[in-house]
Amino acid sequence: MEQSLVKALLKNTNNPRLAWRIFKRIFSSPSEESHGISLDATPTIARILVRAKMHEEIQELHNLILSSSIQKTKLSSLLSVVSIFAKSNHIDKAFPQFQLVRSRFPENKPSVYLYNLLLESCIKERRVEFVSWLYKDMVLCGIAPQTYTFNLLIRALCDSSCVDAARELFDEMPEKGCKPNEFTFGILVRGYCKAGLTDKGLELLNAMESFGVLPNKVIYNTIVSSFCREGRNDDSEKMVEKMREEGLVPDIVTFNSRISALCKEGKVLDASRIFSDMELDEYLGLPRPNSITYNLMLKGFCKVGLLEDAKTLFESIRENDDLASLQSYNIWLQGLVRHGKFIEAETVLKQMTDKGIGPSIYSYNILMDGLCKLGMLSDAKTIVGLMKRNGVCPDAVTYGCLLHGYCSVGKVDAAKSLLQEMMRNNCLPNAYTCNILLHSLWKMGRISEAEELLRKMNEKGYGLDTVTCNIIVDGLCGSGELDKAIEIVKGMRVHGSAALGNLGNSYIGLVDDSLIENNCLPDLITYSTLLNGLCKAGRFAEAKNLFAEMMGEKLQPDSVAYNIFIHHFCKQGKISSAFRVLKDMEKKGCHKSLETYNSLILGLGIKNQIFEIHGLMDEMKEKGISPNICTYNTAIQYLCEGEKVEDATNLLDEMMQKNIAPNVFSFKYLIEAFCKVPDFDMAQEVFETAVSICGQKEGLYSLMFNELLAAGQLLKATELLEAVLDRGFELGTFLYKDLVESLCKKDELEVASGILHKMIDRGYGFDPAALMPVIDGLGKMGNKKEANSFADKMMEMASVGEVANKVDPNARDIHQKKHNKNGGNNWQNILHRDDGSGIALRSLSRVKKGWGQGDISSFQPPRVDYLDYWEDDG
C-alpha cells in the first residue's frame, strides 16, 4: 500500500495539486494503517510541494504531521521535511521547523548528517546567524561533530570575517577527536588570505606536515594568488618554486594569478614573457593559456597603452572561436575608448555583429562613457540611435552617461529634457542619475528647479540617499546659507532624508518619516562640506564643535577633514593653529598629503618664514610626494616676496625639469620680482620664456607692460604696447592712459600721438580721456590743427557707446604712484579740471550742446578668433 501511494504521488509530480489531494485523502482516512502509510510517504509529497513552491500546502502538511498520533513516524516525517527544505535551499523554512522539532522532541537526538546538512544550507544561503545555534544544539545533544562539521563551521566563520574565531575552532578539533584534512587547511588558508593575512596562511601551510597532511595544489594557488593581489610578486615566485620542489606542477590557475598580478602592477612586459612561454608548452611543459589568460594580457596591454601589442593579441583571439567572447571584445573596446580611438571602437562594434557576437548594453555603454567624458555629445547621441536600431534599449547607465555629459558642459536644460525622455521610454532614473542633475542645478544657482527635482524624486520613490543630502548641503554652503545647512545635517541624524524638509515651506512633507530606513545618515563628506563652509566663513568655534560631534557619531575624521582646518588656518595666517591641527592629525594616523603641504607652504609664506618653506619641500621629496603646480607657484610667490629671487628661479627650473608645465602665475611673480630689483634684462628673459611656454597670453603682456611703466621704463613700455596692438589684444588690463600721460610729461608728444594714432587706426575703442594729455600738449605747442583733430575724434568716440577696452580699475591699484592726481578714469573728470586749458573748456561746451551727459564710451574693436584670453588657471 505504501509503495502504491508513493507511485501515485510520483506519477502526478507534474500535477502537484492532484498529488496533494491524493495524499490528504489517504492521510484523512480513519484507518491507522492508512495514516501510517501516508506519513511514510511524507518525503515524497514534501519534495513535490517544495518544487512547486506551494508554501501554504507545505505549512498544512507540517500541521497534519503534528496532529498525528504515531509519535515515532511523526518525528521521522518532520525531520524528513526539514531535510528536504535544507536540500532545496530553503533554510528560512528548514531552520524554524527544526527548532520546533527540537522543542517538541528534546529527548530525540537528530543525526550528525542532518546537522551537517543544515549547516551546509546556512552557508550556501549566507545565513550564518543560524550556525552558532546549530553548533550549540549539537554540543547540548552530545553529538560528536565530524571533521566535515568542523570544516563547515570554520568556513562559516571565515565567510563572516571571523578568522580568529575560525582558528580557535580549528585548534579545538583534536580535543573533539577530529583530525583536520586538506579541506580544513584549504578553508582556513583561504580565510586568512581573504582577510589580508597571507603570512598567517603561509604559516598554516608550513604546519600541515606536522598534522600528517600534505599541501595540495589548491592551497598553494590560494597563497600564490593572495601574494599576487598584494603585489608581492617575489614571494609568489618563491611559492611557485616551492610547489615544484614538492612535486606539484603549477597549473593554469597559478599562471593566471601571476599574470594578473604583474599586469596590475604595470609590469606587462614581464607578464608577456610568461604568456609567451605558456604558448610554447610542448617545449617547456607549461599549461596552455586559456581564455582568461588571453583576456588578462589584453587588459594589461590596454592599461599601459601598448595598443599595437593589444591589437595583435586581439586579432589572434578574434580568429579563434574557442577564445573569442563578448568579454574579450568589451576589454578591447574599453582599451580603445580609454585612449581616444573612437573610430576604431565603432569598427569593433561592427565586427562583433559580423562575428555573431551581439554587442551588449555594457559594450555600448563603454563607448557612451568615453564620448560623454570628452564632451562628444552628438557622437554619443549617434551611439544611442545605433543601439536602438540594433534592438538594444538604453538603460539607466546609458542615460546617466549622457546626462553627466550635458551637465559637465553646463547644458542643464538638455539634461532635464533627457530625464523626461528617459521616463517616457520606461527607463526609470535611479538616485544616481537624478543626483547628477540635482548637483548641476545647485551649482548653477537654479535653486527653485533643484527643489522641484528633489520633490519629484521623492514622489517617484527614487530613494533620496546620503549623496542627495550632501548635494543639498554643499549647495546651501556655496550659496551662503550655512545655518540652513547645519539644520539639515542635524536633522539627518534623526530623520534621515526627511531632514530636507527643513529647507523651507516648499519642502514641508517632502519625505514621509515612516519610509525612512536610515539610508541618509551624514557621512564624512557631509561633515567635511559643512566644516569647509564654516571655516571659510571664519566660524572656527562652530567648526570645532561640529568636528567633536562628528567623532561622537563614531565617524573617524580623515586627512580631508583635518586639511580643511589646516588650509583655512594657514590662509588666515594662523600658522601655529595649523601646526597644532597637524600634530593631532598625525597622532590619529592620518598622513600629510599634497594638500596638507600646499596649505602649510601658503601659511608659512604669509608669515614670511622662507627657511621653513624649503624644509617642507625637502620633506616632500623624502616622502615621495611630488609637488604640483600649486605647490611651486605658492613657493615661488613667497620666495619672490621675500627677495629670494634666485631660489624662486631655481624652483621654476626644477618645475620644468619635472615636466610640470608652468602657468602665467608661475612667471608673474618672477617678472614682478625682477622689475622690483630692478633687473629688466632678467625680467625680459623670464617674459620671453613665459610667452614661449604659455603662448601669446595678453595677461603676460599687460603684466610686463604695467611693470615697465611703473618703473619709468617708458621706451620699453612703448615698444611692448606697440607689439600688443599688432597682436590685436584687448587693452582692459593695460595702463595705456598712464603711458600717454607720462610721455606727454616727458615732452614725448610725438611718441604719445603715434600710439594714439595706432590705436585709432587698428579700430580700438578706448577711454577718450587718454586723448586729453596729447590735446593739451599740442595746444600748448601751438599745433592747433592736430589738437582739434584729436578733440573731434574724442567727441566722436564719446557719442558711440560703452568703452570696450576701459582700463580695469583693479590693474591700477598696484600702481597708485603712477595715477593721475586728479583721480578717476572718466574722461569727464579731466574736462572739468580747472587748469586753464582752453581746449578742455571748448570740448566741454561741445558736450553741453548735445554730445551727451551720460556715460561716455566708444565702439567695440573687431573680434579676432585667435585671441588667447588670460584665464585664471593658477
Curated annotation (Swiss-Prot):
Keywords: Repeat. It holds the Pfam family PPR. InterPro entries: Pentatricopeptide_rpt, TPR-like_helical_dom_sf. PPR repeats lie at residues 111-145, 146-180, 181-215, 216-250, 251-285, 290-320, 325-359, 360-394, 395-429, 430-464, 465-499, 523-557, 558-592, 593-627, 628-662, 663-693, 697-731, 732-766, 767-797. It comes from the Eukaryota. Disulfide bonds: none annotated. Belongs to the PPR family. P subfamily. This is Pentatricopeptide repeat-containing protein At2g17140. It comes from Arabidopsis thaliana.
